[in-house]
Amino acid sequence: MEISLLTDVGQKRTNNQDYVNHYVNRAGRTMIILADGMGGHRAGNIASEMAVTDLGVAWVDTQIDTVNEVREWFAHYLEIENQKIHQLGQDEAYRGMGTTLEVLAIIDNQAIYAHIGDSRIGLIRGEEYHQLTSDHSLVNELLKAGQLTPEEAEAHPQKNIITQSIGQKDEIQPDFGTVILESGDYLLLNSDGLTNMISGSEIRDIVTSDIPLADKTETLVRFANNAGGLDNITVALVSMNEEDAE
């Protein structure tokens, strides 16, 4: 397994409110965590870095080695982090702070993930890009209800309004998923600064191109910047090879 992480401020923003990192626990199991923060001043930067780092530090200390244990860990620790960031957000300096969150662990040939907000996790297998997560956003709710067409959703002025985040008052309702991995698969975690700028077919073409993994993440970010770079752009790309998928 090979992992490449990259974050970029984009073309329009002055600070980067995204954060990404990966961690390995005592059982040698890898977890990748990506967050896209929100809130005025530096609140968004703090929320995203805090969520990623707190969860990562907690993960490193575990011996977790099964998919079921990961799921229980997600359910417990994500809500703890939600409340922690919500409490901090009561302080005037951090008013409105929150963050999206994508957390993905790899156990043998399985990936298990938790999703909150409108960052995304995708699987690139063969010649196809499959979006594994469904955005927790107002526009996606309207789309699913048949009140918007995909084209209208794409250009909707309220596209950035999310319906769930880490740091909200109410208990979070994360989406959980698992995927059985095959040799040659790629997993992509990204903030919306990537997928608002480039299409699934462009992602697929870049990820399946014959260049080193780090060059693929750089190319994804470059394409998003060339398309306008309207937001921070963050990607975590995982390549599964023969041994991982057995």
Swiss-Prot record:
Q: Which NCBIfam families match?
A: Stp1_PP2C_phos
An individual GO BP term: signal transduction
Cofactor(s) recorded for this entry are:
Mn(2+)
- What note does UniProt attach to the cofactor annotation? Binds 2 manganese ions per subunit.
Q: Which residues bind Mn(2+) 1?
A: D36, G37
Which parts of the sequence bind Mn(2+) 2? Answer: D36, D192, D231
Q: Which GO terms describe its molecular function?
A: metal ion binding; protein serine/threonine phosphatase activity
In this protein, which residues make up the domain named PPM-type phosphatase?
A: 2-240
**The keyword Manganese is annotated on this UniProt entry:** yes
Q: What does this protein do?
A: Protein phosphatase able to dephosphorylate StkP-P and other phosphorylated protein substrates. PhpP and its cognate protein kinase StkP appear to constitute a functional signaling couple in vivo, PhpP's primary role being probably to control phosphorylation levels of StkP and of its targets. PhpP thus performs an essential control of StkP activity.
**Protein name, as recorded:** Protein phosphatase PhpP
GO CC, alphabetical: cytoplasm
What are the entry keywords?
Cytoplasm, Hydrolase, Manganese, Metal-binding, Protein phosphatase
In terms of SUPFAM superfamilies, this protein maps to:
PP2C-like (SSF81606)
Reaction(s) the record says it catalyses? O-phospho-L-seryl-[protein] + H2O = L-seryl-[protein] + phosphate; O-phospho-L-threonyl-[protein] + H2O = L-threonyl-[protein] + phosphate
Gene name? phpP
According to the UniProt record, what class of enzyme is this?
A: hydrolase
